[in-house]
Amino acid sequence: MKRSSVSSGGAGRLSMQELRSQDVNKQGLYTPQTKEKPTFGKLSINKPTSERKVSLFGKRTSGHGSRNSQLGIFSSSEKIKDPRPLNDKAFIQQCIRQLCEFLTENGYAHNVSMKSLQAPSVKDFLKIFTFLYGFLCPSYELPDTKFEEEVPRIFKDLGYPFALSKSSMYTVGAPHTWPHIVAALVWLIDCIKIHTAMKESSPLFDDGQPWGEETEDGIMHNKLFLDYTIKCYESFMSGADSFDEMNAELQSKLKDLFNVDAFKLESLEAKNRALNEQIARLEQEREKEPNRLESLRKLKASLQGDVQKYQAYMSNLESHSAILDQKLNGLNEEIARVELECETIKQENTRLQNIIDNQKYSVADIERINHERNELQQTINKLTKDLEAEQQKLWNEELKYARGKEAIETQLAEYHKLARKLKLIPKGAENSKGYDFEIKFNPEAGANCLVKYRAQVYVPLKELLNETEEEINKALNKKMGLEDTLEQLNAMITESKRSVRTLKEEVQKLDDLYQQKIKEAEEEDEKCASELESLEKHKHLLESTVNQGLSEAMNELDAVQREYQLVVQTTTEERRKVGNNLQRLLEMVATHVGSVEKHLEEQIAKVDREYEECMSEDLSENIKEIRDKYEKKATLIKSSEE
């Protein structure tokens, strides 16, 4: 049975106070982010973001005192950056859910819910903290005063790697404070779970048992190694920097434990040196050829392709071999039949030889028999040569048949590949239209398969080609018609642009005329002002010489004023006439622009019905903008005249 990796035995550590030193590559307990209820097991530990070495030493409660050696000491006041996503609302809600579940499951005396934990008060936080810390220190009671110093101090003593400020204790439920505090409470819950598991776990080692069983994380604990670690740590805390005695003692115990043979150590060392040399050689080869893995992968892919080709070739050879085996079986049967006939002939020869031996032949009979035997032997030799020639011819025909079959299969593979690309096969493909264009090669069918596939493939394929050519011709005709329509539209657009350009030139001329009239009116005003100024000077002159003809000067002044009023009235009348003329011109332009706009809208509607996608810009909108612009100018001119 596997034991938990957290032990409470002799080498286990019951205190939850912070260890003297922490692994620099670990930042502390990281709250699990899974949505399921967390169970006790291996806790996730993240690496710090800072690359510099940071001292995570807290208060040490060991009885050995402080360490005097300067080796291995890295101190820094740099704060560790919290890697947890405290700005993530989902993460904070998960932490709140874990806190609420833990409080509910462990008999928290007060009512608590997800809603109440969104922004708790300081009083509620202190109750929750006291309840949680009671699992680690049952006799603890939170003091009534200076809790803002007590709570951060307890977290620091427990080894919480991130600082909690005093000011955050006054604003626990604030949006900028609560995420840090609820993450610290979840960390405290993880510590409680570890502490509970350490209490409930059995001792790692029994008496007289130097080796422990394999734990859940696959680690095989060793009592000798743990004792050695304890002694080295105590010596290290006493100020020692070398541990040769402990190393020698451990080495002797390990030799006794494993019955180490000193003679075998030399062979193992030599083997180790050879392996190290081989590793160095392989490292050098890797440095010399960094892309060797890629080249090996390419070679592997090439070899796999060759293997596939050879497998296909072997399958062809097997099919050919099966055909040859069938023919060989036929030949063996023929040979057996011939051998049987030969045996029958031998028996007949034996019988005839016996008859010959038992009877008396003349010399002529013997010569005749020998002559017949020679003729039969020549016939046999000739037939044997003919048989060998026929067998060679049969072999050549079989080779020719195999090559032809391979060529046909290659052409069929290319045909099927092209048909799949054209979506003609399988039968339910997009362009098959219910026809089966797949050709299954069957050499045993003979010439009848050609007629079958001609009716199955050639005729439907010819129909598809004719339909495709008709669709292409229709598309070309449609394209030509659309191109003609596009040319007509372009001509109409050019004509409309020319009309708009003419209207713009007329409007520009009207603007120039208007500016000229305004300039003339301003010059007239300046002229009147200069005359008025001269009259004012003359008035002052008359006032200085009032004793020389006051009545005459007053009469002259009245005449000049009447003349001035007449000039002002004349100027006002001219301005009114110019404004009326300009307004009439603008109304004429607006009327003309409206008629052009209406005509263009009709043309655009007609064009949209014929070819909706050919319009790239809306000319009526530009004309509307020009019309609105000049209507605004006409309104401004009217208001300025009034």
Curated annotation (Swiss-Prot):
Keywords: Acetylation, Cell cycle, Cell division, Centromere, Chromosome, Coiled coil, Kinetochore, Mitosis, Nucleus, Phosphoprotein. Residues 446-642 are annotated as: Interaction with the C-terminus of CDCA1 and the SPBC24-SPBC25 subcomplex. It holds the Pfam family Ndc80_HEC. Residues 18-33, 63-74 have a biased composition (Polar residues). Phosphorylation begins in S phase of the cell cycle and peaks in mitosis. Phosphorylated by NEK2. Also phosphorylated by AURKA and AURKB. Acetylated at Lys-53 and Lys-59 by KAT5 during mitosis, promoting robust kinetochore-microtubule attachment. Deacetylated by SIRT1. Residues 251-431 are annotated as: Interaction with SMC1A. Acts as a component of the essential kinetochore-associated NDC80 complex, which is required for chromosome segregation and spindle checkpoint activity. Required for kinetochore integrity and the organization of stable microtubule binding sites in the outer plate of the kinetochore. The NDC80 complex synergistically enhances the affinity of the SKA1 complex for microtubules and may allow the NDC80 complex to track depolymerizing microtubules. Plays a role in chromosome congression and is essential for the end-on attachment of the kinetochores to spindle microtubules. This is Kinetochore protein NDC80 homolog. It comes from Homo sapiens. The gene is NDC80.
